């Protein structure tokens, strides 16, 4: 297995800290709003990593957190007259619902920052004791980045003392010094009683503490195997996580760093701050979650994905091919083609080379369809094909539906009944040699984007996009 390590800026062999085990920490969302397609892409990217590792024989523990203490949450909760717990729980439920729709596997653990306050306080106390942190006059506590000789080594941001000094009001020693603890400021603020005084943790200390509490190995040069997240988190968040872990514990937080690329809308980076977010829940109103997943995984995880509906519909053709083939082989048993399994898994073991893997998949779909055309009753062949498709389901997380359900997505039960009635009416017309009426019914349904296919087993139908 090879992965691209952001810190080394090259592909490297994955050599876990413990043989055949992989510990992964993925930065999850700050839950003050609904999740957008950038969140979806990150979740899918590292879901693919997890699936690939598991199918390669690794025992994987994947932790993805919820940041439920943050300025944005506090500000929105105040505006909506809610507690931060009420507000964050709404968006945690929304995020979970969205990712379930995208067939992202549940993490091994989903810690909330609010559940690890004691651990954060202990870590800050350690940093103060070791003289890596300092308190300013308003009670806030900062990490002194000048004390960490490796600061900037992950993101390559300059960490020299030549960084501009900032106002005495904040009393930060260097611009890149970051807050560990925010003291309680009174009305409209949120604070927790602690040995540090009443206040709340900074963003960066939250993740480092949760990594330490949920995954960190004792007596190892690294706490975990892989730390992952979006490219936008590389600096300052991941840089600061790495810094405070080195300072507090004398070890690196992660052996490998992996980052997924941005999602662009109209060639601009999508973000809430730019006001061009495309929420997952809105996309799901137009497209099934599997169709969205199939599209988002189709571009290599490190590349920028420029979202547009034309490409999404083009990518859906791949799913259509999978389900048409699946429809032909349902109800058969057999073993997977070992060459197909080896070839497609090796593609994914090469830093999740999904483009190459999808090319192998397309080749399998074409060749096996041809073989079925030549020998449609070959049960062994059908069983092998179904086993191949099952492996794709496990590896890529697509192709898991019943074909009939897939091709009838977006059609209500009452509409299905109307279509079945029309098919029955058309059948009677054909029996009575009224082919004009039969053709008229087919055309009427086609106008409603319902396509009919006559098969030896009867007429089947599907919804067109």
UniProtKB/Swiss-Prot annotation:
It catalyses: tRNA(Cys) + L-cysteine + ATP = L-cysteinyl-tRNA(Cys) + AMP + diphosphate. A motif ('KMSKS' region) lies at residues 269-273. SMART domains: DALR_2. It comes from the Bacteria. CDD domains: CysRS_core. It is found in: Cytoplasm. ATP binds at residue 272. PANTHER family: CYSTEINE--TRNA LIGASE, CYTOPLASMIC, CYSTEINYL-TRNA SYNTHETASE. Monomer. Belongs to the class-I aminoacyl-tRNA synthetase family. This is Cysteine--tRNA ligase. It comes from Helicobacter pylori (strain J99 / ATCC 700824) (Campylobacter pylori J99).
